[in-house]
UniProtKB/Swiss-Prot annotation:
Species name: Streptococcus pneumoniae (strain Taiwan19F-14)
One of the GO BP terms on file: phospholipid biosynthetic process
Membrane topology of the entry: Multi-pass membrane protein
An example Gene Ontology molecular-function term: acyl-phosphate glycerol-3-phosphate acyltransferase activity
Record flagged with keyword Lipid biosynthesis: yes
Listed name of the protein: Glycerol-3-phosphate acyltransferase
GO CC annotation, single: plasma membrane
Highest taxon of source: Bacteria
UniProt subcellular location: Cell membrane
UniProt main location, coarse: membrane
Membrane-spanning intervals of the chain: 2-22, 54-74, 80-100, 110-130, 143-163, 165-185
Reaction equation(s) it catalyzes: an acyl phosphate + sn-glycerol 3-phosphate = a 1-acyl-sn-glycero-3-phosphate + phosphate
SMART domains: G3P_acyltransf
Length: 213
């Protein structure tokens, strides 16, 4: 019984639409009607500012971490923490508290990885922010980090680097999360190809995007 309750709790944690609620409560703004219409971290930064964007990121990240740690906190045996984390990501993407229309799963997925394999998460953070500096695009950084996660989970155990052993479930979860993130960024990928993707106000913009075109 406790297993079922905690699995439901993991989904409900993921379903907390932090950006949407922050916009409605503190700014009287519905993020779905502004910018990209997304309720995640990036659109929150653009529409509501740095403080709201950072708060959204922190909540979205750590709800993934907390969900992943639920079975450890309650000394639950028999179900991998990754399953709880996956349910949080599903909740974030399809939140019951926001009409099943959620974010792109980047921050919450990162939180899940942090809760299960923090050093591997650090590797992905380096990839993410390195790509962000070079390309000035959150979307490109998210997709690149997703691809790097797949490469890392498949290759690192061969060399005993960061990941010492192959974990079939971790591989499957990484493949699922990476696929979800890339699919959720399909419109961004199209804009990157057309060189019209939105930029952050720093970095090198090596692909010469011009969102005003």
């Amino acid at each position: 019984m406790i297993t079922i309750v905690l699995l439901i709790l993991a989904y409900l944690l993921g379903s907390i639409p932090s950006g949407l609620w922050i916009g409605q409560v503190f700014f009287q703004i519905n993020l779905r009607e502004h910018g990209s219409g997304n309720t995640g971290t990036t659109n929150t930064f653009r529409i509501l500012g740095k403080k709201a964007g950072m708060a959204t990121f922190v909540i979205d990240f750590f709800k993934g971490t907390l969900a992943t740690l639920l079975p450890i906190m309650f000394h639950l045996q028999g179900v991998s923490p990754l399953i709880f984390g996956l349910l949080a990501v599903i909740g974030h993407t399809f939140p019951i508290f926001a009409g099943f229309k959620g974010g792109k799963a980047v921050a919450t997925s990162a939180g899940v990885v942090f809760g299960f394999a923090p050093v591997f998460c650090l590797y992905l953070a380096v990839v993410f922010f390195g790509t962000l500096y070079l390309g000035s695009m959150i979307s490109l950084s998210s997709v690149t980090a997703s691809i790097a996660a797949v490469i890392g989970v498949l290759l690192f155990p061969l060399f005993g680097f960061i990941l010492n052993n192959y974990d079939p479930l971790f591989i499957a979860i990484i493949l699922a999360l990476a696929s979800l993130i890339i699919i959720r960024h399909k419109d961004n990928i199209a804009r990157i190809k057309n060189k019209t993707e939105n930029l952050v106000p720093w970095g090198l913009n090596l692909t010469h995007q011009d969102p005003k075109k």
